[in-house]
């Protein structure tokens, strides 16, 4: 049995294949997943697992150098936005690097997901609970 944090075989595999600047999406239950993208569906029911639960596990094994977030989260989901920023700050400290945070419109965000290595769908049912993570290097 695998000893690492991520037990889900699909998530573990996609993280292990990421190269520098490759992207990975963690999203809520409502984000449309492009047909061209690999879909890893973790949603069991509304809210399970939450967006933050999935993100926290993914970032234990993924080196992150940048993140893209929809601008709309600031006004439509400020509590989750604050939680997300706190998590990214803690991740920066743990990794020992700066994580660049970029904001874009939700429409542009959806277009960018097509370029990601995979889209991991959570059971989150709150607005704009989505992030594109950009892989960094560990050296």
Swiss-Prot record:
Keywords: Carbohydrate metabolism, Cytoplasm, Isomerase
Family of this protein: Belongs to the RbsD / FucU family. RbsD subfamily.
Subunit-structure text: Homodecamer.
EC number(s) on file: 5.4.99.62
Binding site for substrate: 28, 106, 128-130
Cell compartments where the protein resides: Cytoplasm
The protein's annotated pathway: Carbohydrate metabolism; D-ribose degradation; D-ribose 5-phosphate from beta-D-ribopyranose: step 1/2
Gene Ontology molecular function: any one: D-ribose pyranase activity
Primary role: Catalyzes the interconversion of beta-pyran and beta-furan forms of D-ribose.
Protein name: D-ribose pyranase
Catalysed reactions, as listed in the record: beta-D-ribopyranose = beta-D-ribofuranose
Pfam short name (any one): RbsD_FucU
Classification via InterPro entries: D-ribose_pyranase, RbsD-like_sf, RbsD_FucU
A GO CC term assigned to this protein in UniProt: cytosol
Origin species: Klebsiella pneumoniae (strain 342)
Organism taxonomic ancestry: Bacteria, Pseudomonadati, Pseudomonadota, Gammaproteobacteria, Enterobacterales
